[in-house]
From Swiss-Prot:
Gene of this entry: argR
Protein name: Arginine repressor
InterPro entries attached to this UniProt entry: Arg_repress (IPR001669), Arg_repress_C (IPR020899), Arg_repress_C_sf (IPR036251), Arg_repress_DNA-bd (IPR020900), WH-like_DNA-bd_sf (IPR036388), WH_DNA-bd_sf (IPR036390)
Family per record: Belongs to the ArgR family.
Organism encoding this protein: Pectobacterium atrosepticum (strain SCRI 1043 / ATCC BAA-672)
NCBIfam families associated with the record: argR_whole, PRK05066.1
A GO term from the CC aspect: cytoplasm
Keyword terms: Amino-acid biosynthesis, Arginine biosynthesis, Cytoplasm, DNA-binding, Repressor, Transcription, Transcription regulation
Keyword Amino-acid biosynthesis found: yes
Main location: cytoplasm
GO aspect biological process, one term: regulation of arginine biosynthetic process
Pathway(s): Amino-acid biosynthesis; L-arginine biosynthesis [regulation]
């Protein structure tokens, strides 16, 4: 029982540190956790935790590349840092193309898919850093493009 409490404390401390959005390397996270009293933490454990909790590297408000956690599981929202993961949005006659930070496309596509047809999204296809989005019936590609710009607070 004591061991699971220690594990829960480690997870809480780990998540709290990542919410600060100031750690650019795994070794920085290791040292911060050691400072919090977790002496047995090492880089491989931090690496496994980053993977387990879906942490991504993105730019913080100071434009530094840092580790952060996406919104909690469930339907993601567009609150920071997700909107910071969208780098560019463009369109042609058929689709809206969204470029994201590496590794972020599937997370952003999941958000868009959760909005659904009522918001103009028929569906998405996501790679590592690129998303193709097609409009639902009754919506033009340009309308979808403009809605996505507003959603991620990009310039019109």
């Amino acid at each position: 029982m004591r061991n699971s409490t220690k594990q829960e404390d480690l997870v809480k401390a780990f998540k709290a540190l990542l919410k600060e959005e100031k750690f650019s390397s795994q070794s920085e996270i290791v040292h911060a956790l050691q400072d919090e009293g977790f002496e047995n933490i090492n880089q491989s454990k931090v690496s496994r935790m980053l993977t387990k909790f879906g942490a991504v590297r993105t730019r913080n408000a100071k434009m530094e590349m840092v580790y952060c956690l996406p919104a909690e599981l469930g339907v993601p929202t567009t609150s920071s840092p997700l909107k910071n993961l969208v780098l560019d949005v463009d369109y042609n006659d058929a689709v809206v193309v969204i470029h994201t930070s590496p590794g972020a496309a599937q997370l952003i596509a999941r958000l868009l898919d959760s909005l659904g047809k009522s918001e103009g999204i028929l569906g998405t296809i996501a790679g590592d850093d690129t998303i193709f989005t097609t409009p639902a019936r009754g919506f033009s590609v340009k309308q979808l493009y403009e809605a996505i710009l507003v959603l991620f607070e990009q310039e019109l």
